[in-house]
Regions:
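Sec-dependent N-terminal signal peptides
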Residues: 17-27
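A structural signal for short beta-strand/turn segments enriched in small hydrophobics and glycine
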Residues: 60, 91-93, 146-158
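Zn2+-dependent peptidoglycan hydrolase active-site motif and core
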Residues: 87-139, 167
Length: 210
C-alpha cells in the first residue's frame, strides 16, 4: 500500500527549485536593467546655455578651494537677489529641495548666519549621463522632482542659502556624474581649476526660440 507521501515530497522539492531558479533569474534581470545603462558611455554634450535671462551679462568666477569646474555666477549690473534662474537645457528634475542647511541670509538680512552645503537647490538630468546643478537658491525651487522642464524655463531665484557668503548662483555641469568644464552656447567657459581666483564675463543666449 502506498500513501503518496514520497511523491508529494518530490513534487514539493521540484516546485521549490523552480521557484528558486525563477527568483534568481528575476534578480539577475533586475540587476542588468539597473547596471546596463551605467556601463554605456555618455552621450554628446547638450547645447547648454547660461542659466540666466537672455541678454544679461554675468561674471563667472572661482577661487582656491572652490573645487575644479565649479562656477559662481554674479550679475554685472543690478541686484543679484531674486534674479531668475533658468534651466540650461531641457531635461527632467531629479532633485528639488535642500542640500545641507539653509542658514538665515535673506535680502532683508544679508549678513545673517550661514548655513551648510548648497541650501535650496535643483538638479536636472538631461539624458546621456549629462546633468546640471543649481545651488544657493533664494527659496524653495519652482519645480518638483519628476517634472520635465524646457531650456530657459525658470526653476528658481538667486539667493544665498546654504554655505554662501553673498547672493549668487553656484552652477555645475556633470558628465557621467563627474564635474567637467562648463560650456555655454557651444563654447568652453574657461573656468577650470580652482588654483587661483579668476573670472570671465559672458552674455546669456538663453533666449526664447527664434
Amino acid at each position: 500500500m502506498t500513501t503518496g507521501e514520497p511523491s508529494t515530497r518530490r513534487t514539493r522539492r521540484r516546485v521549490a527549485r523552480v521557484v528558486l531558479v525563477a527568483s534568481v533569474v528575476a534578480a539577475l534581470v533586475a540587476v542588468a536593467v539597473v547596471v546596463a545603462p551605467l556601463l554605456l558611455p555618455p552621450g554628446p554634450r547638450p547645447a547648454f546655455q547660461l542659466p540666466v535671462a537672455c541678454g544679461e551679462t554675468w561674471r563667472l568666477s572661482t577661487y582656491p578651494g572652490h573645487d575644479d569646474y565649479d562656477v559662481d555666477l554674479f550679475p554685472t549690473e543690478g541686484e543679484a537677489w531674486g534674479r531668475p534662474v533658468l534651466a540650461s537645457y531641457a531635461g527632467e528634475v531629479t532633485v528639488a529641495g535642500i542640500n545641507g542647511s539653509l542658514g538665515a541670509r535673506t535680502p532683508d538680512n544679508p549678513k545673517g548666519p550661514r548655513g551648510r552645503g548648497g541650501g535650496y537647490w535643483v538638479k536636472i538630468d538631461h539624458g546621456g549621463k549629462w546633468e546640471t546643478q543649481y545651488l544657493h537658491l533664494l527659496e524653495p525651487p519652482l519645480v518638483r522632482v519628476g517634472q520635465r522642464v524646457a531650456r530657459g524655463e525658470q526653476i528658481g531665484r538667486v539667493g544665498s542659502t546654504g554655505n554662501s557668503g553673498a547672493p549668487h548662483l553656484h552652477y555645475e555641469q556633470r558628465r557621467g556624474w563627474q564635474k567637467v568644464e562648463t560650456y555655454f552656447d557651444g563654447q568652453p567657459s574657461g573656468i577650470t581649476e580652482d588654483d587661483r581666483e579668476y573670472a570671465v564675463r559672458l552674455t546669456s543666449d538663453n533666449c526664447a526660440p527664434r
